[in-house]
Curated annotation (Swiss-Prot):
<protein>
    <recommendedName>
        <fullName>Gamma-sarcoglycan</fullName>
    </recommendedName>
</protein>
<feature type="disulfide bond">
    <location>
        <begin position="265"/>
        <end position="290"/>
    </location>
</feature>
<feature type="topological domain" description="Extracellular">
    <location>
        <begin position="59"/>
        <end position="291"/>
    </location>
</feature>
<comment type="function">
    <text>Component of the sarcoglycan complex, a subcomplex of the dystrophin-glycoprotein complex which forms a link between the F-actin cytoskeleton and the extracellular matrix.</text>
</comment>
<dbReference type="GO" id="GO:0061024">
    <property type="term" value="P:membrane organization"/>
</dbReference>
<dbReference type="InterPro" id="IPR006875">
    <property type="entry name" value="Sarcoglycan"/>
</dbReference>
<feature type="transmembrane region" description="Helical; Signal-anchor for type II membrane protein">
    <location>
        <begin position="38"/>
        <end position="58"/>
    </location>
</feature>
<keyword id="KW-0812">Transmembrane</keyword>
<dbReference type="GO" id="GO:0042383">
    <property type="term" value="C:sarcolemma"/>
</dbReference>
<dbReference type="GO" id="GO:0016012">
    <property type="term" value="C:sarcoglycan complex"/>
</dbReference>
<dbReference type="GO" id="GO:0005737">
    <property type="term" value="C:cytoplasm"/>
</dbReference>
<keyword id="KW-1133">Transmembrane helix</keyword>
<comment type="subunit">
    <text>Interacts with the syntrophin SNTA1 and FLNC. Cross-link to form 2 major subcomplexes: one consisting of SGCB, SGCD and SGCG and the other consisting of SGCB and SGCD. The association between SGCB and SGCG is particularly strong while SGCA is loosely associated with the other sarcoglycans.</text>
</comment>
<dbReference type="GO" id="GO:0005886">
    <property type="term" value="C:plasma membrane"/>
</dbReference>
<dbReference type="Pfam" id="PF04790">
    <property type="entry name" value="Sarcoglycan_1"/>
</dbReference>
<keyword id="KW-0735">Signal-anchor</keyword>
<keyword id="KW-1015">Disulfide bond</keyword>
Amino acid sequence: MVREQYTTVTEGTHIERPENQHIYKIGIYGWRKRCLYLFVLLLLAILVVNLALTIWILKVMWFSPIGMGHLHVTADGLRLEGESEFLFPLYAKEIRSRVDSSLLLQSTQNVTVSARNSEGEVTGRVKVGAQMVEVQSQHFQINSEDGKPLFSAEEQDVVVGTGRLRVTGPEGALFEHSVETPLVRADPFQDLRLESPTRSLSMDAPRGVHVKANAGKLEALSQMDIILQSSEGVLVLDAETVGLTKLKQGTQGPAGSSNGFYEICACPDGKLYLSMAGEVTTCEEHSHVCL
C-alpha cells in the first residue's frame, strides 16, 4: 500500500523530489484488454447480423410505409390485394371486395362463417362443405335487390315470398304434412296431378275448393268409391251432355212388379229425383218435387 505525502509549498520555494518516486499507469493491459476488444468485436458482429436480418425481413415481407405486401393499412381498415391464404380463423367486422371484382372464399375442406354474441356464443353459422350447405340460425331469410323477402325459414314455418313457386323435378314435390296455399296449377300444356300413394288426399277450404281445367279434361280415378256429397247445398252438373257409361242393364221381371226399382227423373232446371218404376213412366206423378 502506497502512502502519499503532501507538502505545502510557498511561492519562490524550490523543493526537489526524491529520486525513488513511484509512477503508476492507469488502464487495462494484457489479457483483459484482449478480452474487451474481442467482446466489442462480437457485439459489433451481432449488430451487423441483426441489421442484415432486419433488412432481409423487410424486403421479403414487402414492408412499406402503407402496409405489408398486398396488405395496406387505410383509414377505413385493412385492404388486401390479390389472393391470400389464412391458416387460422379470421375475425372481422366487415369483409368486402373491390368495386370491379367479386369476393371469392375458397377452401379445400369447407368455408364456415360464424356470428357470436358478447359472451362468445355462436348465434348464427353458415357452413359450405363439399356435400352440402348448412345454415344454423333462429331465422333464415333471402331478400331481393329491393329488400323484398323471397324466402324465409324458421322453426315453426317456411315462407316463400315470390309470386310463384315452381317445382321442375320429374317426381314433383313431396310434402310429409299439410300444405296451405291459395292456388295450385301446372305449367301451360302440362298435366297437374295430386297423388297420395299410400294414404288419403284431402283438400279443405272454408269458402270452397275450385278445380278448373281451361284446355283439357278433369279426371278423377279411384279403385273404390267416389263420393260427391253436399251437406246443405246441391250437386250441380253443368254441361251440355251428362253421360253415365258402363251401367248395368236390367232384366225383365214379372209383369206389374217393380221389385223396388226406381227411375231417374229430371226437372226443367236440371234437378234430378227418383220415382217408383212402373210399366210406364211415373215421373209426372211425382213432379211436385220440381215446384
